[in-house]
From Swiss-Prot:
Reaction(s) this enzyme catalyzes, per UniProt: a 5'-end diphospho-ribonucleoside in mRNA + GTP + H(+) = a 5'-end (5'-triphosphoguanosine)-ribonucleoside in mRNA + diphosphate; a 5'-end (5'-triphosphoguanosine)-ribonucleoside in mRNA + S-adenosyl-L-methionine = a 5'-end (N(7)-methyl 5'-triphosphoguanosine)-ribonucleoside in mRNA + S-adenosyl-L-homocysteine; 5'-triphosphoadenylyl-(2'->5')-adenylyl-(2'->5')-adenosine + 2 H2O = 2 AMP + ATP + 2 H(+)
The protein's Enzyme Commission number: 3.1.4.-, 2.7.7.50, 2.1.1.56
Region (2'-5'-phosphodiesterase activity): 693-835
Pfam families: Rotavirus_VP3 (PF06929)
Name this protein carries in UniProt: Protein VP3
2'-O-methyltransferase activity: annotated segments: 246-428
The species this protein was found in: Rotavirus A (strain RVA/Human/United States/DS-1/1976/G2P1B[4]) (RV-A)
């Protein structure tokens, strides 16, 4: 949802839009909670409170002040990510398709012939890093830019088996126009930039597990971040290959040679970061014009020095000349060298051309070895061709996508590799490598071992759920890693499947109850965004590919109502209750009935079950930004930091009742996952709360009334307001609590409206209006370690007779309290108070 704050209402009516006017009788947190549970996508928030907007944004719900009608029109028609700290809106708006336009934020693409393969009459537009060049389109009171591009489609095409780009992009645009926006993926780039900048400032050592090509620009300015990936393809790994011949296959209709060069250099750069944790000088021989350098410089201040007879316009220092072996001495330490020398074929026949290519490859290797033979902190990536050759066994092979698969690949070596044992590699083996291998990642660092790191902050986004990892080791890492942000795939199956398929692999599934740690926040993508200064206009949908975000060691942990809070917890319930359910009271009725409370009069205002916990359990797939376990734990320890005003603390027994209702719901729905989740949350409640039951009571609290509107034959009809099991030494503490609640007890609005048989020969009158106070007193007794209340649900009633009688219904009648007392069962009254 998105909340657009206005000082005045607007005349125009928008689809899927609701107006909410700030309620001055409620505090900012309660207003935020009410807004978050509205069911429309667009909320026009009138007479707004800035504090309420802050609360929503911290909860991951985009809430923005609107000053102009143009701002309203722009934001209401598309989705966006909002940086609420810096007041920047990143639109995810593809309406530019209506201008016959596709967009990119990678400059090198604009220098290709891609426009020859677009839809007829269409063009390509460069929009800058995260759409920064579009800022001029929006003269708004906040900074606004459209981060939507088609780079995801272009890159997917490059790695696909499709050759016809026009058909490919047509299909993808049609898909985009007919499916839900994958907003988490679109906003992820904004999030990653913010995340790693924040963590790099706050932590000395940061470890990142499983980066992919989407992050290849993100880490350019973070050389100290340690990367773990799937490891490199080494020369010695070719021993498994059978020999093949030249294949010759076109991968792309438009020229992607620049993309290949960029990937080669970035792969080498990240290998240098991994070894030396600082930025090198980047030397490049050949590969002009290298327009992609412009892209790299949008993210970092890396320095390039280049040699090529052709221009390289974005190099810091370009030598418009050939590079010779003697020029190697000009290259400094703390550098990487990219060698991409290859003469144009011209009119040479293939045999003559082959000799030239192999000769140049030998020359390239000679330059590489000479560069690595002296000095320190150097890595080289050199262009190779399939030929009979000796290569160091520990050198890395690279074969990033290029326009055509022919004979070309690349070799990456550091100083140690260049001096390592060499092995003869036949030409046919190298063809086998070229024909069958595409390097899919610029990050080729070693795999991560699932062990805790003492001094590091560990980030593992979408990296650990793969069933190649041992599930128990993943859980152990999350439980024990003190500082981390780790995601795992949430179990939103209905049959409690332990693993689910994803693309061509399987992922383990997890629930919050699979982990045992305090001090960590378990939330959704949206909830995590709020913690890092971002919010989003479209909540994650339960697609089957959703992830828990687990933050350990965060200073936000105790701020219970600010981050990963209960906002939107009833939204799914409202959507169903007010559209397709039998009654809008269905949730209240079901919760009472499933706990054997059959007095449904006033069930919507006096419910005996925690609606928060019930909704968090049965609709966890729709809103798991609310960290239920943390909420339970912090209340059980009394350590919750509450910023808001009015805040109702549930009695632990209300939470137990909610689990029982959720369990009943799960059985009716045949939802095995909710069934397990409910059981495990109930077990967790019993673990963190020391709940004792007065199932063998020796005292009770009685309430005597001045008026009873029914016939009765008991001596003194009274409401048993709970039973206790206490020693005589605890009587003063129990009496003190009753005295403390005197005004609230006598202020209860108690009513009755019918009689019924509670059991055989127990004839009673119903009582309404006491549950809220009962649970407050329950909490007070619990905190003083006084055993109060039974294991079965408290059903307030007044016993009228110990015989079978017919039900009587009367108009709702108010009952007036005469006295409240504490009495020993089958004994004397030890305390009595009147108003």
């Amino acid at each position: 949802m998105k909340v657009l704050a206005l000082r005045h209402s607007v005349a125009q009516i928008y689809a899927d839009t609701q107006v909410y006017t700030h309620d001055d009788s409620k505090d900012d947190y309660e207003n935020a909670f009410l807004i978050s549970n509205l069911t429309t996508h667009n909320i026009l928030y009138l007479n707004y409170s800035v504090k309420t907007l802050q609360i929503l944004n911290k909860s991951g719900i985009a809430a923005i002040e609107i000053q102009k009608i143009d701002e309203l029109f722009t934001l209401i028609r598309c989705n966006f990510t909002y940086d609420y700290i810096d007041d920047v809106v990143y639109l995810h708006d593809y309406s530019y398709y209506a201008n016959n336009e596709i967009r990119t934020d990678q400059y090198w693409v604009t220098k290709t012939n891609i426009e020859d393969y677009l839809l007829p009459g269409w063009k390509l537009t460069y929009v800058g890093y995260n759409g920064s060049d579009t800022r001029g389109h929006y003269n708004f009171s906040f900074r606004c830019q459209n981060a939507a591009t088609d780079d995801d489609v272009i890159i997917e095409y490059i790695y696909s088996n499709e050759l016809d780009f026009q058909n490919f992009i047509l299909k993808k645009i049609k898909e985009r126009m007919t499916t839900s926006l994958p907003i988490a993926r679109l906003s992820n780039r904004v999030f990653r930039d913010k995340l790693f900048k924040t963590l790099s400032v706050n932590h000395d050592k940061v470890v990142n597990v499983g980066p992919r090509n989407e992050s290849m620009f993100t880490f350019l300015d973070h050389p100290s971040i340690k990367q773990f990936s799937n490891g490199p393809y080494l020369v010695k790994d070719t021993i498994k290959l059978k020999q093949e011949r030249w294949l010759g296959k076109r991968l792309s209709q438009f020229d992607i040679g620049q993309y290949k060069n960029m990937l080669n250099v970035l792969t080498t750069l990240y290998q240098y970061y991994d070894m030396y944790h600082e930025k090198p000088i980047i030397y490049m021989i050949g590969s002009a014009p290298s327009y992609w350098i412009y892209d790299v410089k949008q993210y970092s201040d890396l320095k390039f020095e280049t040699w090529d007879p052709l221009d390289t316009p974005y190099s810091n220092l370009h030598h418009k000349e050939l590079f010779y072996i003697n020029d190697v001495q000009k290259l400094k330490d703390n550098s990487i060298l990219y060698i991409d020398i290859r003469t144009d074929r011209g009119n040479m026949d293939w045999k003559e051309w082959r000799k030239v290519v192999e000769g140049q490859t030998a020359d390239n290797l000679h330059i590489a070895y000479k560069y690595l033979s002296t000095g320190k902190a150097k890595i080289c990536c050199v262009k190779m061709t399939a030929m009979d050759v000796e290569l160091p066994i520990s050198a890395k092979l690279l074969h990033h996508p290029t326009t055509e698969i022919r004979s070309e690949f690349y070799l990456m070596m550091d100083i140690w590799d260049s001096k390592n044992i060499k092995r003869f590699i036949p030409k046919g083996v190298l063809y086998s490598y070229i024909n069958n291998t595409i390097t899919e990642n610029v990050f080729i660092q070693q795999p991560f071992k699932l062990k805790t790191l003492k001094n590091e902050y560990v980030i593992a986004l979408y990296a650990l759920s793969n069933d190649l990892n041992n599930r128990e080791d993943v859980v152990k890492l999350i439980n024990n890693q003190k500082r981390a942000l780790i995601t795992v795939r949430i179990n939103n199956t209905f049959k409690d499947e332990p693993k689910v398929g994803f693309k061509n692999i399987y992922d383990w599934t997890f629930l919050p109850t699979d982990f045992e740690m305090n001090g960590s926040i378990i939330t959704s993508y949206d909830g995590c965004l709020g913690i890092f200064g971002l919010s989003i206009s479209l909540a994650s949908k339960p697609t089957g590919n959703n992830h828990l975000f687990i933050l350990s060691g965060t200073d936000k942990y105790f701020k219970l109502d600010q981050f990963a809070n209960h906002m939107s917890i009833s939204r799914r319930s409202h959507q169903i209750r007010f559209s397709e359910s039998a009654t809008s009271y269905s949730g209240y009725i079901f919760r009472d009935l499933s706990n054997n409370n059959f007095n449904l009069i006033g069930t919507n205002v006096e419910n005996s079950v925690s609606g928060h916990v019930y909704n968090a359990l049965i609709y966890y797939r729709y809103n798991y930004s609310f960290d239920l376990k943390r909420w339970i734990y912090l209340h059980s320890t009394g350590k919750a930091s509450i910023e808001g005003g009015k805040y109702y603390e549930h009695a632990p027994i209300e939470l137990i009742y909610a689990c029982r209702s959720a369990r009943e719901f799960a059985k009716l729905q045949d939802d095995l996952t909710v069934l397990r989740y409910s059981n495990e949350i109930e077990n967790y409640i019993n673990k963190v709360y020391s709940i004792t039951y007065a199932d063998d009571p020796n005292y009770f609290i009685g309430i005597k009334f001045k008026n009873i509107p029914y016939k009765y034959n008991v001596k003194v009809p009274h409401l048993t307001f709970g039973v206790l099991n206490i020693s005589e030494q605890m009587l003063p503490d129990a009496i003190a609590i009753l005295k403390k609640f005197k005004n609230e007890l006598f202020g209860m609005d108690i009513t009755t409206s019918y009689t019924y048989m509670l059991s055989d020969e127990v004839y009673v009158a119903n009582i309404s209006g006491v549950l809220s106070t009962y649970f407050k007193i329950y909490n007070a007794f619990y905190k003083e370690q006084i055993t109060f209340g039974q294991s079965r649900m408290f059903i307030p009633h007044v016993t009228l007779s110990f015989s079978n009688e017919k039900t009587v219904r009367i108009d709702t009648t108010k009952l007036y309290i005469d006295s409240i007392y504490l009495r020993k069962i089958k004994g004397d009254t030890v305390f009595d108070m009147t108003e």
